[in-house]
């Protein structure tokens, strides 16, 4: 029986978060000093990013604003202008990198596309996400593509209705328990969790090991054996 397979973009279809982690390392070195340990700096940045999450802020520009806000709470006022200028440089240096697909994506999609309906549901800044989709070379393999500001239960319900999906045969596939797995399950979809060691810390959440509507796989290529 054909299913509808919906794929996350960042760190599922293509690599993403490692660019942000490298930027965070530079930010940490930039603002370090006094009583602020590396762990405390990361916690402060996480606090700011968590608040931005709920406003739908994502992408490099939002990340830059978050670093600026965190820096304002960490460094002395006299030093702040220099630090903020350096933060802007960190964001500029992130640039527009070439899209690097995760291992096995092309061959796996080619095989799955012959049996199932494929879609992309990715969260973030629309311009950035569409640039990745267009630059990935795989957009033509998908029937449905949606860039959203929030991945919550309401979003998945909206997609089910708008795309006329059957939740019982629709699977959300991704690396984020918080964005891909839990809200999709709350909306009645099934889910495939593909862990990625580079997953953003704020995307982590506990999954119910007894939930038989979630499959955990070790790699993207393993989807072929399941579908």
Where are these regions (language model features)?
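Active-site neighborhood of HAD-like aspartate-dependent phosphohydrolases
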Residues: 1-44
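Active-site periphery "cap/insert" segments of enzyme catalytic domains
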Residues: 95-110
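A metal-dependent, Asp-based hydrolase signature
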Residues: 43-93, 111
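Asp-based, Mg2+/Mn2+-dependent phosphohydrolase catalytic module
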Residues: 1-3, 106, 110, 125-227
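Short helix-capping segments at alpha-helix termini
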Residues: 33-37, 76-78, 137-141, 164
